Amino acid sequence: MGSIGAVSMEFCFDVFKELKVHHANENIFYSPFTIISALAMVYLGAKDSTRTQINKVVRFDKLPGFGDSVEAQCGTSVNVHSSLRDILNQITKPNDVYSFSLASRLYAEETYPILPEYLQCVKELYRGGLESINFQTAADQARGLINSWVESQTNGMIKNVLQPSSVDSQTAMVLVNAIVFKGLWEKAFKDEDTQAIPFRVTEQESKPVQMMYQIGLFKVASMASEKMKILELPFASGTMSMWVLLPDEVSGLEQLETTISFEKMTEWISSNIMEERRIKVYLPRMKMEEKYNLTSVLMAMGITDLFSSSANLSGISSAGSLKISQAAHAAYAEIYEAGREVIGSAEAGADATSVSEEFRVDHPFLYCIKHNLTNSILFFGRCISP
């Protein structure tokens, strides 16, 4: 392991393992990469065991350039943060085929003095930074201000990232992190081909969903031993793809969840396993939106000091008692028909009779949206019911 892609994938599955515990039989959707970049903002100012724990969970020391002698004034290898920043800049750069809206910020109770050098570093490296706010005597108003900021940064898509009563007069610092994604496929699904088809939630229960359909050349793989198959659906521009991991059986998701790991995923999506074939693809139209308080998840993973009185954030504030009271995360994405190239009806019609292989996503599955250049997992999800 030695790349941001590998680090994000390892972290992704560690988070998933914990989220599964708290959200049995529910849809799950989150952005491992942006959680890492949010924790990196904290890591900049963390010291001693607080810093060690974050590093152990996120594995910053596995990144190229981690131990370089060129130290930033923030006391952390610049390369780690600049490589995260470069990917963030790359994916959030405005273009006509996909859009990312990111809101990531620390909010500290205003009575804590914040070190100017920390503010400078976090602004340079993460464009977001830290705001001081009045939790002590106006907690609900502070919550409203934070929610409004996130809503405006995400074009109105993510509302109320902080739930009522999630902050109070004792709140020291809150980490908020929210991301929205909309993208065009390389090959569009035609609107008129979308129709209501039953999605089998369990062996006994099904519900109608809007099922998109197309025939085309796609990279696909069947894993007989794992009883599942994988499909890659490229977004326009080729820098990102959605990967769908579909169990063979309606009830096969649990086995897949138990099996999946960084090593397995790397093996499954490798070029010597995936092969391009002409297939019929059925994929539900989906709107994914989930919000999490990641405090318990990160604590279960081993970041405990950060959320307790043992926190050492002396690189952020000279006040010894600063800690994080809550880490809020929200992710939103839409999967719909729009794409860059539309395949003509005549071409598709001629294919329909000659193509027999199907990839029919009509029962629970796992999926991820991956940045192909760096192999970073931008989003990971479980769909029990679209």
UniProtKB/Swiss-Prot annotation:
Lineage start: Eukaryota, Metazoa, Chordata, Craniata, Vertebrata
Glycan-carrying positions: 293, 312, 372
Record key words, sorted: Acetylation, Disulfide bond, Glycoprotein, Phosphoprotein, Secreted, Signal
Gene responsible for this protein: SERPINB14
UniProt name for this protein: Ovalbumin
Gene Ontology molecular functions: serine-type endopeptidase inhibitor activity
Record-annotated disulphide pairs: 74-121
Signal peptide: 22-48
Post-translational modification comment from the UniProt entry: The signal sequence is not cleaved. The functional signal for membrane translocation of ovalbumin becomes accessible when the nascent chain is 50 to 60 residues long. The hydrophobic sequence which lies between residues 27 and 43 folds back on the preceding residues to form an amphipathic hairpin structure which is the signal element recognized by the membrane.
Entries under Pfam families matching the protein: Serpin
Matching SMART domains: SERPIN (SM00093)
